[in-house]
C-alpha cells in the first residue's frame, strides 16, 4: 500500500510512505545514477511489542523529518526530488527470523537501498547478515551488540547510536567507583543481554568490583519476582538489570514493590530510554544513574529539534528517534555528495567522515569497523519535585568524550572484508 506523506499513526503503520512532490519541484536525478530512479529507505523495528515506544512508528517520523530537512536544505540543488524518496517500514516483532524475512523483502522486492533502526540485537545481526550478503546498506540505531562492529562487522553495516561497551563503560564503571562493589546481574537470555552481561562484568571488574552472580531470564518477560529474590538473597550492593523497554519497566516496578531499595540494594540500569521513565513515572526511577547517547533537553539545538518532533509525534524523542534522524540525514548527505545510491560509493564517502548534527556531537565514522563514535552522557533521573514539565526527567552529570566512550578500534575484533 502506498500513501502520501502524513503525520498520522495510520500512515506510519501503512508499510510504505511515498513522499509527494514539493512546491518548487526540483531536478531529476542523473540518468542511471539511482536504481529504479529513486531512493528507498527502509525502517525495520518493533512496532507492536516491548520496544515500540523507544523505537517503533516514531522512528519513522524521525526519518521523515530527515528527508524533509534534506530537501529544504538543498532545494532545487537536491540530487533526488521529494517524489524520488520513498520510506518503507515493517514490524520485525523482535524475532530474528522475522527480521531476516522482512529484510529480504525490503532489499529484494521493495528495492530498499538502506535499512535503518532494527532494535533487538539478534534481529540486528540477522539484518546485518542480509545486508552483507546483498551488498546493501544497514545503519543500525536500535541494537546494542558490539558484534556489529566486532567479529560480525561488514563493509555495508554501520553502528550509529550506542552499544554495550559504551553503556558499561559509563554506568558500570561509575556505579562501582561510587561504592557499588558487589553486583548481581539480571539479563535477558539473547544476544543483547548476553553481550550486556559480558560488558558490564568486565567494566565492574576493571573498576575494582565483583560480579558475584548473573541470572538469565526469558525474553520478553512479565514476571521478574523470582529472579529479583534470587539476586537479592546474597545481599549485593547492586542489582544490575540489563533489560530494556517494557521488560525494564516490569522489572523496576517489581524491584520497588519488593522494597529492595529500602533494604539498601541499589538498582543499576544498563540501558534506559526516556520513554521508559515516562511510562512508569519519574518517582520509580528517582536517582538512577545511567549512560545516555542523547537527551532532548541537553541544549538549545536538541530542544528545538525535539519541539518539532513533539508536534509531529505527540511525544518527546528518545535517543533512538534522534539517532534514526541522524542516520537518515547523513545517508542523504552521502547521496547528495556522490550523486548515486551505489552502496560501495556511499561507504567510501562515509568512511572516516567527521559528523556534527543534532544527535552526533564530535561524531566520527570509523573506517576500520564502522563504529560511529560521538560524545555520550552520564545522566541521573530527577526527583519528582525537580520536574518542571512533561518529559523533564534527567540531569546530565557529565559528558564522556567520543574517544573515551566507545571501545578502541584495536580491541573490536573487526576484520573488514
Q: How should these model regions be labeled?
A:
Residues 54-78, 198-206:
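Short, polar/charged alpha-helical segment
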Residues 31-35, 39-64, 90-96, 119-120, ...:
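Extracytoplasmic "Venus flytrap"
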Residues 311-321, 332-396:
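Segments of small-molecule ligand-sensing domains
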Residues 106-119, 139-141, 184-187, 235-245, ...:
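Periplasmic-binding protein-like
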Residues 255-327, 336-339, 392-417:
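Extracellular/periplasmic periplasmic-binding protein-like sensory domains
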Residues 26-32, 55-59, 73-151, 160, ...:
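Beta-alpha junction/loop-to-helix N-cap segments that form part of ligand/metal-binding clefts
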Residues 98-101, 146-147, 154-257, 294-304:
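Extracellular/periplasmic Venus flytrap/periplasmic-binding protein
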Residues 1-40, 413-417:
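Short, low-complexity disordered leader/linker segments with a strong preference
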Amino acid at each position: 500500500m502506498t500513501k502520501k506523506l502524513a503525520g498520522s499513526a495510520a500512515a506510519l503503520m501503512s508499510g510504505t510512505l511515498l513522499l509527494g512532490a514539493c512546491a518548487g519541484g526540483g531536478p531529476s536525478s542523473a540518468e542511471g545514477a539511482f536504481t529504479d530512479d529513486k531512493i528507498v529507505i527502509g525502517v525495520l523495528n518493533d512496532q507492536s511489542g516491548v520496544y515500540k515506544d523507544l523505537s517503533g512508528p516514531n522512528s519513522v517520523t524521525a526519518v521523515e523529518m530527515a528527508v524533509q530537512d534534506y530537501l529544504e536544505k538543498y532545494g532545487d540543488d537536491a540530487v533526488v526530488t521529494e517524489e524520488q524518496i520513498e520510506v518503507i517500514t515493517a514490524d520485525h516483532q523482535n524475532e530474528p527470523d522475522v527480521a531476516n524475512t522482512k529484510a529480504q523483502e525490503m532489499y529484494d522486492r521493495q528495492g530498499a537501498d538502506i535499512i535503518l533502526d532494527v532494535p533487538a540485537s539478534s534481529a540486528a545481526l540477522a539484518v546485518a547478515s542480509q545486508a552483507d550478503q546483498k551488498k546493501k546498506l544497514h545503519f543500525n540505531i536500535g541494537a546494542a551488540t558490539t558484534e556489529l562492529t566486532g567479529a560480525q562487522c561488514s563493509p555495508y553495516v554501520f553502528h550509529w547510536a550506542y552499544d554495550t561497551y559504551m553503556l558499561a563503560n559509563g554506568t558500570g564503571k561509575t556505579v562501582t567507583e561510587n561504592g557499588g562493589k558487589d553486583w548481581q546481574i539480571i539479563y535477558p537470555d539473547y544476544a543483547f543481554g548476553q553481550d550486556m552481561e559480558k560488558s558490564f562484568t568486565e567494566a565492574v571488574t576493571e573498576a575494582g568490583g565483583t560480579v558475584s552472580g548473573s541470572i538469565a531470564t526469558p525474553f520478553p518477560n512479565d514476571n521478574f519476582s523470582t529472579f529479583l529474590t534470587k539476586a537479592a538473597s546474597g545481599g549485593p550492593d547492586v542489582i544490575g538489570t540489563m533489560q530494556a523497554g517494557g521488560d525494564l519497566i516490569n522489572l523496576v516496578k517489581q524491584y520497588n514493590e519488593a522494597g529492595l531499595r529500602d533494604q539498601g540494594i541499589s538498582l543499576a540500569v544498563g540501558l534506559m530510554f526516556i520513554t521508559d521513565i515516562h511510562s512508569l513515572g519519574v518517582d520509580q526511577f528517582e536517582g538512577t544513574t545511567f549512560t545516555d547517547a542523547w537527551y532532548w533537553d541537553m541544549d538549545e539545538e536538541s530542544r528545538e529539534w525535539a519541539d518539532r518532533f513533539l508536534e509531529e509525534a505527540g511525544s518527546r524523542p528518545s535517543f533512538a528517534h534522534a539517532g534514526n534522524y541522524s542516520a537518515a540525514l547523513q545517508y542523504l548527505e552521502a547521496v547528495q555528495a556522490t550523486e548515486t545510491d551505489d552502496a560501495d560509493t556511499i561507504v567510501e564517502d562515509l568512511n572516516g567522515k567527521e559528523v556534527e548534527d543534532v544527535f552526533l556531537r564530535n561524531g566520527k565514522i570509523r573506517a576500520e569497523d564502522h563504529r560511529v563514535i560521538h560524545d555520550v552522557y552520564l545522566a541521573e533521573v530527577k526527583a519528582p519535585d525537580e520536574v518542571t514539565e512533561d518529559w523533564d526527567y534527567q540531569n546530565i552529570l557529565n559528558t564522556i568524550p567520543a574517544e573515551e566512550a566507545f571501545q578502541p578500534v584495536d580491541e573490536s575484533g573487526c576484520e573488514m572484508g
